[in-house]
Amino acid sequence: NKIFTNCGTLGMLEEYGCAFEKTGRGSVKVSIRINPGEGAGHSKKTNTGGPYSKHGIWYENLSEARNIAKRHGLIISGVHTHIGSGGDMDHLKRIAGKLVDFAKQFSDLEVVNFGGGLPYQYDPNLPQDDISRYKSILNERVGILEQYFGRKIVCEIEPGRRFVAGCGYLVGEVRALNHTFEEDGKRLDYVLGNIGFCHLIRPMAYGSFHPIWIVGDDLGPDQNIIIAGPV
């Protein structure tokens, strides 16, 4: 097959190159994912760039990536980065600039993928992040590359989460109530539902915010409660 493979480590690039030489199958053109040395996200747990992220070839090792590709007869025609989920426009702009600088090191460049990470605000009481600048940021960066190489460069982004993050609801049922007391006598009330982190892991894994609405008749007065799952 001629699948355009994106290699995220030097080892992956080496493995692909060995298989390509041995079998003669696959695409001679490949892409590499670059770790630009920094990341951004709404928390450290959604940060996929920088020294504490496993993702991507470290930006100082790009010459080694070129050597591996040359040794196996591969052409690095694409570069890619993705720094995390929920970064702001200033971070995305800076990383896009870095990727342009990295891309100039690959003379056969055809495709540059700026990744995703466009922020989405789950809290209905807060304004949605403005991403109107993003198009102009990318147009400017791609224009720099096209001027540098003297040809058209394909620009790719991964905006999917921004568009679908608010498109669904997880519906559950209250199955039990419980309460405990702290040492000072303060009462803690729990609502136990039939849905939990096995259905929506994001709050537990990332500390992410998701609004909760309790629907029903005769809910009683407002009070502080702790929402818990069945496990």
Please identify what each model-predicted range represents.
Residues 149:
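Nucleotide-activated donor-binding/catalytic signature segment of Leloir-type glycosyltransferases, i.e.
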Residues 88-95, 122-133, 164-176:
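Short glycine/threonine-rich loop-to-helix capping motif typified by GTGT followed
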